[in-house]
């Protein structure tokens, strides 16, 4: 296993560990999801580049665009939550309590 793949796998596991340990604030969970998505994106780009040599470049751009859309949607949800509940705590997100 190359050191490059080891770094990508460690980033992925750091993202999972961050989600498990930082479940209090929504912003930290979103940052950990971004770390997961970026590590998967780098792994997919590396695998496709080794396999197809630039033929699948458009798929990488689509995945990167979708990750940017996911980040903006998560940030807008966090802003809406913090405006209505005055905090970004995950415990205040339970809709059934209202």
From Swiss-Prot:
It is found in: Mitochondrion membrane. It holds the Pfam family Oxidored_q2. It is a multi-pass membrane protein. InterPro entries: NADH_UbQ_OxRdtase_chain4L/K (IPR001133), NUOK/Mnh_C1-like (IPR039428). One of its GO terms (biological process) is ATP synthesis coupled electron transport. Its main location: mitochondrion. Its EC number is 7.1.1.2. Keywords: Electron transport, Membrane, Mitochondrion, NAD, Respiratory chain, Translocase, Transmembrane, Transmembrane helix, Transport, Ubiquinone. GO terms for molecular function: NADH dehydrogenase (ubiquinone) activity. It catalyses: a ubiquinone + NADH + 5 H(+)(in) = a ubiquinol + NAD(+) + 4 H(+)(out). GO terms for cellular component: mitochondrial membrane; NADH dehydrogenase complex. The chain crosses the membrane at residues 1-21, 24-44, 61-81. It comes from the Eukaryota. Belongs to the complex I subunit 4L family. PANTHER family: NADH-UBIQUINONE OXIDOREDUCTASE CHAIN 4L, NADH-UBIQUINONE OXIDOREDUCTASE SUBUNIT ND4L. Core subunit of the mitochondrial membrane respiratory chain NADH dehydrogenase (Complex I) that is believed to belong to the minimal assembly required for catalysis. Complex I functions in the transfer of electrons from NADH to the respiratory chain. The immediate electron acceptor for the enzyme is believed to be ubiquinone. This is NADH-ubiquinone oxidoreductase chain 4L. It comes from Pisaster ochraceus (Ochre sea star).
């Amino acid at each position: 296993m190359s050191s490059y793949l080891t770094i990508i796998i460690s980033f992925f596991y750091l993202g999972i560990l961050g989600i498990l340990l930082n479940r209090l604030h929504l912003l930290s969970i979103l940052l950990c999801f971004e770390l997961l998505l970026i590590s998967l994106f780098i792994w997919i780009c590396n695998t496709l580049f080794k396999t197809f040599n630039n033929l699948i470049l458009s798929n990488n751009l689509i995945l990167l665009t979708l990750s940017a859309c996911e980040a903006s949607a998560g940030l807008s949800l966090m802003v809406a939550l913090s405006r209505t509940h005055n905090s970004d705590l995950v415990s205040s997100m339970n809709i059934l309590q209202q």
